[in-house]
Amino acid sequence: MKQRALWSAVLIAVLAMSGCGSASGPKEADKGSNGGKLVVWDWKSGDATAASYIKKAKADFAKSHPDTTVEFVAQPFEQYYTLLGAAIQAGKGPDVMLFNGGGQIRDRVDSLVAIDEYIAGDKQRLAGWDAFGKAGKTYAAPVTLQGHPIYYNKALYKKAGLNPDSPPRTWTEFLANCAAIAKAGAKCFGQGNKEGIGIQFFMSGLGSGILTPKEYDDWIAGKRDWQAPGVKRLFQLWKEVSDAGLNTDGANSTAMFNDAFAQFQSGKAAHMIGLMSDIGHWKDFNEFLKPENVGVMIAPVVTDGATPSLPYDGGIGYAVAKWTKDPKLAADLVRSLTSTDALASFYADAGAIASDTTIDVSTAGPAVATIVADLKSGKPALHVALSSKTIDLMGRLSQQLISGSVTVDEALKQLAASDKPA
């Protein structure tokens, strides 16, 4: 009873918090679902780089729904899924909400509307749908494509006497480059694992060079064998890289966002498994290092027979809450949020690789050109296939692997148990 009372108190507090400092909390969002007002929760609309995107999306929606008010409530990302979870528990909240692709949305589809009947006309234009679907149904429309290219600093390669236009193809070559880079005064990897996020980037960024094609495809299909040789090698490599001092110092006390990225941008590390969109990506790195010094490479081959590819999925996407009173109206807003003009602004201002395949990115520089070219042979990211519960556990275990308080075999045993269907 005490636990139940405590949870009730926490839930009330979180719901109250979600309205603090903004024009709308869950109660107002509930009132807003009568057709006269739609409330959107996200963590993007408050960013200056998203201002033009939001403005164009609202203008597009207003053409068809001039009498409907749209209100965006930008929540802090660190608390976003806690606040959203509280709203879901209460059965009331925003009409439209932003999700990361993968486990975060798949774990919550019972609270969302399947939007397939509303977005059929957008299926060919937009890419990245699979990350927002479950059991053959679609629950959000992709705004961005998100992936994990391996960025490298061409200026550091030159300083180390390496060919900046010929990144390593094998792990042996990669380690040799790391040794040369160390002599030049830099670390091999920028790494931040304070929140347990570093292992996600490592797994997806390097995984296609470690797992065999069958191991990779089985993993994505949900037939995961946590004792498969490639899977075990991936976690061994995570520990080996740390033990060998290839990471920037203090990985477990360094935040990925944005301290680890800053290490790469400042020239303290030669490689960074980053993002394609939003942050820690080509546009940020271009600003600090200059476009001509930002290289992009795919994973070096660790296991014979591995076929390296760019790991990517739908990045972020907007979904419709089950409690909204007019799902079609809310879905129309989602369509406006994924309209070509709006997404073109998001690409131009924020550097997002938009889900809209018709947007011209030819003037963005060599890093983007490489990323876009690699999309054709790309595959879904390994960590995106996991549930949020398993992702959280993997983050904690990755920290323990670095500190030496758990072995690879023990970690894999726990992860296998977590990954079993409920």
Question: Which role fits each region the language model picked out?
Answer:
Residues 100-149, 175, 295:
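Hinge/lid segment of periplasmic solute-binding proteins
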Residues 139-143, 148, 173-224:
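Extracytoplasmic/periplasmic solute-binding protein
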Residues 176-178, 220-252:
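Glycine-centered hinge/linker elements that transmit conformational signals in sensory
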Residues 1-39, 63, 119, 358, ...:
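Short, low-complexity disordered leader/linker segments with a strong preference
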Residues 63, 160, 243-247, 285-349, ...:
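Extracytoplasmic/periplasmic substrate-recognition and gating elements
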Residues 349-353, 357-358, 367-419:
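C-terminal capping/gating helix-and-loop segments adjacent to ligand/active sites or protein-protein/ligand interfaces
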Residues 33-46, 68-73, 95-96, 139, ...:
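Short, well-ordered beta-strand elements
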Residues 59-126, 159-161, 166, 262, ...:
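Extracytoplasmic "Venus flytrap"/periplasmic binding protein-like
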